[in-house]
Design a protein with these regions (language model features):
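Single conserved hydrophobic/aromatic residue that forms the stacking wall/gate
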Residues: 1-8, 12
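Short, basic/hydrophobic alpha-helical segments
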Residues: 13-25, 192-199
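Conserved GNAT acetyl-CoA-binding A-motif
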Residues: 22-33, 199-207
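Short, glycine/charge-rich beta-strand/loop segments that flank catalytic centers
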Residues: 25-43, 56-58
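Conserved active-site alpha-helix within GNAT-family acetyltransferase domains
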Residues: 36-52, 80, 210-227
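Acyltransferase donor/substrate-recognition loop-hinge adjacent to the catalytic core
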Residues: 45-121
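A conserved beta-strand-loop-helix scaffold within acyl/acetyltransferase catalytic domains
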Residues: 93-179
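Aromatic (often tryptophan-rich) hydrophobic motifs at membrane interfaces
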Residues: 145-236
Length: 237
């Protein structure tokens, strides 16, 4: 059940009662989207709560067609990077839809990517992310996700995992990793994954930036149509 449905308000009330009656503690809720917050406010459920926008957790929402075609002046640099990649590595790469049979190879690539990045990871963001990555990879057969990769000279050099919600025609990009030394590779898999795996998507949610400046700039450079706000809702003490 989506958080913004009427059922979510019932769940909220039960949780509040449980926190108060059984645990004698205030109820704090993280990562509440803007629509859910508004529904709860209109229902009068948040009179005794503060709401704090968590910028580091805002999701980035894009027009899928723009990311697939890279058309328009705003995407000119991105398109140039893709074209540069196509010219420089012509005949050496292929896009491939990946499946559970490719998991061990994907894990091997991911480990290599992690080892190369940890040296520059001052705030342990990579290790914080790693648990979620391996949970996804380890449950390949039980989760409804798509996975795609770029093979360079036969070996995986980039991979992406995402999912699709047909009711809102939105693709969600959960993981995207590529060899950073290969110029244009991130841009190419970004584009090709959507083209091959989510052709019907109207919107793309590339999730949050974890508060990392480089990731924030990269996501902003793709010109999101909006940011999906997230809130920390805290019961007043």
């Amino acid at each position: 059940t989506p958080l913004y449905s009427s059922a979510a308000s019932d769940v909220y009330k039960r949780q509040e009662k449980q926190f108060h009656d059984e645990w004698n503690t205030p109820l704090d809720i993280y990562l509440v989207d803007d629509l859910t917050k508004n529904v709860w406010e209109q229902a009068g459920l948040l009179k005794n709560y503060t709401r704090t926008a968590e910028r580091d957790s805002f999701d980035y929402i894009y027009e899928a067609e723009k990311l697939k075609t890279l058309s328009g002046r705003a995407m000119h640099k991105k398109k140039n990077l893709v074209n540069s990649f196509l010219r420089e590595y012509e005949g050496r790469f292929v896009y491939e839809t990946l499946g559970c049979g490719d998991i061990e190879e994907v894990k091997e690539f991911h480990e290599k990517w992690l080892d190369e990045r940890r040296h520059y990871d001052r705030f342990n963001c990579i290790d914080d992310e790693e648990e979620g990555v391996y949970r996804l990879l380890g449950n390949c057969k039980s989760i409804d996700c798509a996975m795609g990769g770029i093979r360079m000279d036969g070996k995986i050099a980039a991979y992406t995992i995402g999912s699709y919600c047909p009711s809102i025609q939105c693709a969600f990009i959960h993981i995207e990793k590529a060899e950073p030394e290969i110029k244009g590779l991130y841009n190419y898999i970004n584009q090709q994954f959507l083209i091959h795996e989510f052709p019907d998507a109207v919107y793309v949610n590339r999730e949050d930036d974890l508060g990392q400046d480089n990731l924030r700039q990269a996501k902003l450079s793709y010109k999101p149509i909006r940011l999906e706000e997230k809130y920390y809702i805290q019961e007043k003490r």
